[in-house]
Amino acid sequence: LKVRPAGSFIQGPLPTGCALCEAGAKMVLFVTGVCHYKCFYCPISEEKRMSRDAWANERKLDWSDEKAALDAMVEEARSLNAKGTGITGGDPLYDPERTVRAIRHLKATFGPKHHVHLYTQIPFDIKWLAALQEAGLDELRFHPPDETWETPDSHPAYARLWLKAKEMEDAGLWDVGFEIPCIPGSQEQMSNLVGWLGAHKFRFINLNEMEFSETNYEAMLSRGYRIKDTETSRALDSEEVAREVMRRHAGGPTTIHFCSSPFKDRIQLKQRLSRQAERRAKPYEIATEDGTLVRGVIECPDPADMMAEIAAAFEVGAEMMEAAEGRVLIAPWLLEQFADEVPFPAYFSERYPTATELEVERIPLNEPAEDAPLPARRVPVVERELADLHKLGRPGQ
């Protein structure tokens, strides 16, 4: 058993897709929210659940204009210098045509080394295996419904599909693995599944620490599951189940990888945001160690006039400022020097380097005059909280 960062652990080699996710080098392509399984532990947000919309990380894609959607997808991948893409949902195979076209476009744009892995649960038409492989899919991850874990052979619609995909892996066409949540109390069923995978020499299985989210907590609590601690959304005893399954199958042919909830947030997501912050930072912004961007903001009725006054009075160059709707965006290290002389609200704004520019913290720098005119539109502040991380494109969700 090898201990990995943030409470994760593994026996066997780390899957390629996981290594790239750990480096923050994977874009998350959410193809569709459609899925008929209604798993009680599903953490998907209400906005995405059963929606036919697509997202590349936090960027919503309008697939009614496919070319524009594919162009936006590529732009998002470039925003983090992505070395690969994880395709998820819902279930991407509810829209296999869209999924195949997206894979082809990614490979055509970034080349064969752009690693693409895909999560799927449904027993889809076996013909799509060839289509996915020909499009360039590198890694196929099956997410079997929990009712199939105890006796996989009793569910031939699934088993046939999995074994056919394994034949293609044996022919050197791609990698095949599995991914399931560690449901407390399910160690017997999970162990049976891992034993079946080992008997057929499947490459790996990822065991995800089960988590509470805004959309699943009622269903989880009603089934008796409890939160492990007050600082995270982890389910009590989920990790212990993973350790027991690993103990039973130590030395087996199938890699068993436990991916903890803190790992997804503290390592995987943080690394991805840091890559985006580095590439998206404007001259007047500071990229932080947390993967956020900090800028100065002045709220005012006439940003162009405000910029002209600042340039004249404080000798601030044009590259250190930008006019926005009802605001001047400015280098925070410069704004700090003269914020007290500005008659309008001035503050530091910390935001995620994402398409939505989610603001996570605001630090006031002055006390503007009570009669200072304000812009008609005020920017809402969104406090930093774990629930928002589910909006930030975590692979596998």
Where are these regions (language model features)?
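Radical SAM enzyme core and accessory elements
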Residues: L1-F9, R279-Q397
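Canonical Radical SAM [4Fe-4S] cluster-binding loop centered on the CxxxCxxC motif
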Residues: K2-S8, P13-D65
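Hydrophobic faces of well-ordered beta-strands that scaffold small-molecule active sites
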Residues: K26-L29, T85-I87, H114-L118, L140-F142, ...
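Conserved mixed alpha/beta catalytic, RNA-binding, or beta-rich assembly cores of soluble enzyme
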Residues: G33, K48, D65-A72, N81-T85, ...
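Canonical radical SAM enzyme core domain
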Residues: R52-D71, L93-L137, H143-A157, I180-N192
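Conserved C-terminal portion of the radical SAM core fold
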Residues: R160-I267, P283-G291
